[in-house]
C-alpha cells in the first residue's frame, strides 16, 4: 500500500461516549474511507501510530433523513472502524507527527 493511500484510509478519530467506553477495553475508533478494507485499516494504523493491531471491526452507519424548513435532507453515511490494540499499547492523538 502506497503512502498516499495510508493517509486517505483514516479520516480521523471518532469521539463519542461509546468510543470512550471502547477505549477502556483497549480499542480505538476511527472514521474511515467508505472503500477502506480491514487489512488496509490495520496496515494504516500500524504504520502511522507504530502500534500492533490485533483486530479490526468495521461498521457502516446510514445517514438519517432529517426534516428541514425546505423539506427533507439526508445526513452523510459514515464508516467507522473499531481497532483493537495489543495489550499495553495506546495511541496518543496529541503526540502524532
Swiss-Prot record:
Instruction: Cite a single GO MF annotation.
Output: rRNA binding
Q: Does the keyword Nucleus apply?
A: no
Which GO BP terms sit in this record?
translation
Q: Per the record, what is one GO cellular component? A: ribosome
What Pfam families does UniProt report for this protein, alphabetically? Ribosomal_L23
Q: Which domain of life is it from?
A: Bacteria
Q: Which InterPro entries match?
A: Nucleotide-bd_a/b_plait_sf, Ribosomal_uL23-like, Ribosomal_uL23/eL15/eS24_sf, Ribosomal_uL23_CS
Q: Which UniProt keywords apply?
A: Ribonucleoprotein, Ribosomal protein, RNA-binding, rRNA-binding
Stated family: Belongs to the universal ribosomal protein uL23 family.
Function, as annotated, reads:
One of the early assembly proteins it binds 23S rRNA. One of the proteins that surrounds the polypeptide exit tunnel on the outside of the ribosome. Forms the main docking site for trigger factor binding to the ribosome.
State the oligomer form and interacting partners. Answer: Part of the 50S ribosomal subunit. Contacts protein L29, and trigger factor when it is bound to the ribosome.
- What name appears for this protein in its UniProt entry? Large ribosomal subunit protein uL23
- Organism the protein comes from: Marinobacter nauticus (strain ATCC 700491 / DSM 11845 / VT8) (Marinobacter aquaeolei)
Q: Which gene encodes it?
A: rplW
